[in-house]
Amino acid sequence: MRSVLYFISSAHCKGIMNTLFILFQNIVPQHLLSRCTGFLAALRHPQWLKNRLIRRFISHFGVDMSEAAESDYTRYACFNDFFTRALREGARPLAAADILCPADGAISQLGEIANGLLFQAKGRYFSAEDLLGGDVARAAQFAGGQFATIYLAPKDYHRLHMPVAGRLTGTCYIPGQLFSVNGVTAENVDRLFARNERLVCYFDTEFGPMAMVLVGAMIVAGIETVWSGPVAPPPKRPVTVDYLTLPESVELAKGDEMGRFMLGSTVILLFPKDVVSFDERFGAGTLTRMGEALGSFA
């Protein structure tokens, strides 16, 4: 009886803490907090403060610096440089597979885009149309297709790589909120990924269109791409770029870096119908490493 009461009490306390956490997410000035975090993360002086921030982060989150190209944390010019650190050569060999994991992290969800909806968590869904900023034509390209949502934890390698070779056809920056992205918010915030600020990147590949959606979150100091650098559009206004009309194309090979998160978040992959089959070992919570096999062409 005591154990039952303890379980009920623990579950009740957890529920209260989760409710308070979500309430905090709604009342805190999300963008101001993220800008302040970005300011601190870019500080180069005083060096003792920069080094202390990095050292405490490594200790708290258990970052494996043996994989880094530069393992001495004091040699990073600022926290952002440390957070987006490169890996040593050979740390992430590319698998001989059709489709590679684009990032270190964990599978949040993956599966079919059924009736235009992507599964979020515990009975919560969001539409591909909403995720892509209301673009009906783009969303139709992925109707009945497959999606994979990968969450990058603070300790992870935070550069994103191409799961397949592709030519960039367009991008769309979509302004939004900056809820934290984790299990608690996924289970309690409706349409989380379709509400947060995000950058949608569209590619033409050998099997058809593919979308990579880089989702921002609270205290994420920024998103960068290899073709345009930091994404810094006017606030509260969507910005679309058609790369097919530009004089020089952006073509990336499978495994090439395509972008990075300043303090991390989530990447969502969208594939068309009857094109992709994910490896059976992947499911919600499965850890991923950039470059390992994610799936194959159907």
Region annotations inferred by a language model:
Residues 5-298:
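Contiguous, well-folded functional domains in the mature portion of proteins
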